Swiss-Prot record:
The lineage of its organism: Bacteria, Bacillati, Bacillota, Bacilli, Bacillales. ATP binds at K202, E324, G350, G351, D352, S353. The keyword Manganese does not apply. Its main location: cytoplasm. The gene is pgk. This is Phosphoglycerate kinase.
């Protein structure tokens, strides 16, 4: 990683504005998964131990640029206080006189949390005035919100232009090291598994990965567009007619580059979306015209598991089927299990794949689970991440 991190600077006595990703799922005001809070702890502890005055900033949900108690960071602050074993204060404002006063009272090793940065319309517009308002609170800017690093917002990118020292936190440092090595100097054989519902969302990723991988595995809703491109009938399965030509181009590119391109050989079908009309598995050339597929079948799981077993590095992004419904979860579970059982270094690209690994109790068997869905996707497309680009070079 060619960007400075908190390991490269002295933070003692400094006001450190740290952008974290505390955008956690809530139900009735209670946190249902605190993974993102825990992921920020190493950076927070490093700063506290180094004698910094720590100012944490994050977004939560999409409050559309206005204050909404439903999206307050209060539940996060309560959980963070428990995890750190110290009383942490929530500041009602994220910038301006109230925030400035709270910061002025900080002692070395203290931690405060500013209220949701998306309560201000300038945040998502990367408004320079708001960015300057954040910068007024800080001597140092630390970005540790990998989940928001692909967005050029006031608290992720804008602020970096108004402070002298802007560095990465430990989480972003690790993400960039792991993903960066996979894309620039991968252990081989290198296999990528791409699932999810739409080809449109994964065009950049598939295109970029075909330049690097030895094997590309396709699953999930987007596989039916590829199967259709090969001449199979896919019934009422998810299909992007306008992406069939693109799918053909990808298969041609794989052939030209000598990349093994694996697609489903069987699938799990149903008459209608849901578990009531579940039929079971069928070979890929036997999908009835009035049925749809919602998962890969057992033969495909076996085929994919063999490819995973033969790999030294596997990147997985996107589920193999509608894993939220048990009858269509076996494909995703099978792939997750194969990864858990293999000796390969496994990188799970955030979002649904991470949720699936969690659901099947296999998360701790994966080598690296990325904390950024969109960010890891854009990084795998070879795109620069604004929240990283703005940091100081080494």
């Amino acid at each position: 990683m060619n960007k400075k991190s908190i390991r490269d600077i002295d933070v003692k006595g400094k006001r450190v504005f740290t952008r974290v990703d505390f955008n956690v799922p809530l139900e009735d005001g209670k946190i249902t998964d605190d993974t993102r809070i825990r992921a920020a702890l190493p950076t927070i502890k490093h700063l506290v131990d180094g004698g910094a005055k720590v100012i944490l900033a994050s977004h939560m949900g999409r409050p559309k640029g206005e204050k909404n108690p439903e999206f307050s960071l209060a539940p996060v602050v309560a959980r963070l206080s428990e995890l750190l074993g110290k009383d942490i204060k929530l500041v009602e404002e994220a910038y301006g006189p109230v925030a400035e006063e709270a910061v002025s009272k900080l002692e070395e090793g203290d931690v405060i949390v500013l209220e949701n940065v998306r309560f201000y319309p300038g945040e998502t517009k990367n408004d320079p005035e708001l960015a300057e308002g954040f910068a007024k609170l800080a001597d140092v800017f630390v970005n540790d919100a990998f989940g928001a690093a692909h967005r050029a917002h006031a608290s992720t990118e804008g602020i970096a232009h108004h402070v002298e020292t802007a560095v990465a936190g430990l989480l972003i440092e690790k993400e960039l090291q792991v993903l960066g090595k996979a894309l620039s100097n991968p252990d081989r054989p290198f296999t990528a598994i791409i699932g999810g519902s739409k080809v449109a969302d994964k065009i950049g990723v598939i295109d970029h990965l075909l330049d690097i991988v030895d094997t590309l595995i396709i699953g999930g809703g987007l596989s039916y567009t590829f199967l259709k491109a090969q001449g199979y009938e896919v019934g009422t399965s998810l299909l992007e007619v306008d992406k069939i030509e693109q799918a053909k181009e990808f298969m041609k590119k794989a052939e030209d580059k000598g990349v093994k391109f694996l697609m489903p050989v069987d699938c799990v079908i149903t008459k209608e979306f849901g578990e009531e009309t579940y039929v079971g598995s069928r070979d890929i050339d036997s999908i009835p015209a009035d049925h749809m597929s919602l998962d890969i079948g057992p033969k495909t799981v076996e085929l994919y598991a063999e490819a995973i077993k033969a790999s030294k590095l596997v990147v997985w992004n996107g589920p193999m089927g509608v894993f939220e419904l048990d009858k269509y979860a076996n494909g995703t579970k099978g792939v997750a299990q194969a990864l858990a059982d293999s000796d390969a270094y496994s990188i799970i690209g955030g979002g649904d794949s991470a949720a699936a690994a969690e659901k099947f109790g296999l998360a701790d068997k994966m080598s690296h689970i990325s904390t950024g869905g969109g960010a890891s996707l854009e990084f795998m497309e070879g795109k620069a991440l604004p929240g990283v680009e703005a940091l100081n070079d080494k």
